[in-house]
């Protein structure tokens, strides 16, 4: 089951989300499924977008062990789960948000940056240095009506070692992860 949000105002989102059985919660919307991300227990499924970020790192052979990672964004949809998944991969993680003091210098210290800020082009060249891997989760529409990420791709791409594009980056992998979760949920039901 995939619940599209926001729900109409007369519905209680928390009640509806938590009515889902974890085995059908393919995008980690219930509190119980989310607890699995934070405890390391296999309850339900992890959220698709943070898992997509981890799969991108795995696909390109980026070992997180001992690396400094910065997650820009602290939502329960991407930021916090991504941070926990990076910790599970033995990275040292800092979560940045709107109240982080001197965020560009914090980000420059990282080896890996996951950006889920929710604002177009918020991360520019002053946030990065050579050798970094940048995963841009953002999906925005710029003034020209084109899709763009939370990272100023044109300014950042020449500096860093690797960066995901928007469109065609994390979103595509997220869709693949979601399909995988749906298939796995069906297989679990059939084999139960």
Positions of predicted regions on the chain:
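Rossmann-fold NAD(P)-binding glycine/threonine-rich loop
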Residues: 12-38, 131, 135-191
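Anion-binding alpha/beta catalytic cores of soluble intermediary-metabolism enzymes, centered on
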Residues: 2-64
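Glycine-rich, N-terminal phosphate-binding loop of Rossmann-like dinucleotide-binding domains
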Residues: 5, 117, 137-138
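Glycine-rich phosphate/diphosphate-binding loop of Rossmann-like nucleotide-binding domains
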Residues: 35, 41-133, 142, 146-157
């Amino acid at each position: 089951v995939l619940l599209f949000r926001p729900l109409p105002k007369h519905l209680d989102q928390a009640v509806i989300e938590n009515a889902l059985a974890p085995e059908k919660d393919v995008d980690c919307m219930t509190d119980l499924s989310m607890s699995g991300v934070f405890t390391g227990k296999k309850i339900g499924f992890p959220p698709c977008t943070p898992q997509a970020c981890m799969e991108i790192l795995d696909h390109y052979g980026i070992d997180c062990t001992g690396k400094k990672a910065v997650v820009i964004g602290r939502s329960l949809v991407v930021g916090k789960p991504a941070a926990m998944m990076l910790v599970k991969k033995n990275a040292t993680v800092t979560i940045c948000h709107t109240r982080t003091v001197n965020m560009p210098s914090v980000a420059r210290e990282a080896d890996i940056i996951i950006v889920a800020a929710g604002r177009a082009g918020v991360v520019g060249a002053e946030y990065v240095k050579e050798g970094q891997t940048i995963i841009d989760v953002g999906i925005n529409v710029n003034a020209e009506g084109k899709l763009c990420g939370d990272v100023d791709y044109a300014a950042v791409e020449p500096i860093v070692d690797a960066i995901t594009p928007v469109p065609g980056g994390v979103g595509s992998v997220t869709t693949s992860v979601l399909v995988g979760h749906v298939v796995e949920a069906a297989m679990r039901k059939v084999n139960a």
